[in-house]
Design a protein with these regions (language model features):
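Gly/Ala-rich beta-loop-alpha elbow adjacent to hydrolase catalytic centers
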Residues: 249, 253, 257
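Short coil/turn segments that connect the beta-strands within blades of beta-propeller domains
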Residues: 13, 59-60, 98
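Beta-propeller blade signature
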Residues: 31-37, 115-117
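Cap/lid segment of the alpha/beta-hydrolase catalytic domain
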Residues: 127-237, 243, 250, 278
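A flexible loop/linker signature enriched in serine peptidases of the S9 family
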Residues: 1-6, 18-32, 45-52, 64-73, ...
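Conserved beta-strand position repeated across blades of beta-propeller domains
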Residues: 8-10, 56, 94
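Hydrolase active-site cap/lid region
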Residues: 207-209, 257-284
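Non-catalytic accessory segments flanking enzyme active sites
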Residues: 1, 6, 65, 81-158, ...
């Protein structure tokens, strides 16, 4: 095969995997692929336009995790239903004695093990109880913002309208910020900063076309528009009046931070460029 794949499993008497049918298709969704006896690779669910994270078969039923608009959800692919549709991130799942167990977190709650039944999560572990009893955690405000050219999933932690704000840009860009517990955001908020983050075009979780909308000469154009427009609008939604704004990001987020401050040098009071990819030719 010319693809890039892993997570091999058998389903309906055929070998399957999660990955790319052709390795140079990236960036695109990782999908469930069917591998014939002759080695031919085809899409199992060609119309399912989301990024598949993990797949597993249990009692002849195929389940998989997938990203969708900042959530990572568990789907019964055989019966074409989601087992949960909450603002959570499911990181892994397993089955035992006809019960479903998941490792999950949310924006304000770190990882725990839950039993999943009828779309509801029941916590059964206490791994982070001592942490959450001692440490204040911050929940988010969420809004899908219309930038005029796209709709962008945007999150904000509100500390105070008179507090400074950090715009944080994720790496990738083919990944997503999410309804997940992110220690960096929690640390910034606890230090007194409002935090805003978004999934601009180029991010995963919104399908193939959205993910590839930074390719070619759109790099640094469509994504910068989405980042800055969603940031400005989210500040208004949150009622923040302080104009002391900072910007930061790592990897691709470091590139975008550098790109933005070079195009808009007076927009932010401070900038932090982390492990940035600034030049494709040299990979510096």
């Amino acid at each position: 095969s010319k693809g890039s794949m892993g997570n091999l499993f058998y389903y309906e008497d055929a070998l399957h995997a999660v990955g790319l049918r052709k390795r140079f298709d990236w960036p695109t969704n990782t999908s469930i692929l069917k591998i014939s006896n002759s080695g031919k690779v085809s899409y199992k669910f060609h119309s399912f336009d989301r990024n598949v994270v993990k797949a597993e078969v249990n009692e002849s039923i195929l389940y998989f995790l997938y990203e969708d608009s900042g959530k990572t959800l568990l789907r019964d692919a055989t019966n074409n239903i989601d087992l949960i549709n909450s603002e959570v991130t499911i990181k892994d799942f397993a089955f035992n004695d006809e019960k479903t167990y998941v490792i999950a977190n949310s924006f304000s709650s770190p990882d725990e093990i839950y039993e999943l039944s009828n779309g509801q999560l029941t916590k059964i572990s206490k791994a982070n109880n001592s942490f959450t009893k001692k440490v204040k955690t911050w929940d988010c405000q969420y809004k899908r913002i219309d930038t005029g050219k796209s709709e962008v999933d945007t999150w904000g932690i509100f500390v105070g309208k008179d507090k400074p704000t950090i715009l944080n840009i994720h790496g990738g860009p083919a990944t997503q910020y999410a309804f997940t517990f992110f220690d960096e955001f929690q640390t910034y908020a606890s230090a007194g900063f409002n935090v805003i983050a978004c999934n601009p075009r180029g991010s995963s979780g919104r399908g193939h076309d959205f993910l590839r909308d930074v390719c070619g000469n759109k790099w640094g154009v469509t994504d910068m528009h989405d980042v800055l427009t969603s940031f400005k609008n989210m500040k208004k939604v949150m009622g923040i009046t302080n104009k002391n704004d900072g910007i930061m990001g790592g990897s691709y987020g470091g590139f975008m931070t550098s790109w933005i401050i070079s195009h808009h040098p007076n927009m932010f009071k401070s900038a932090i460029v982390e492990r940035a990819l600034l030049n494709w030719e040299t990979m510096v």
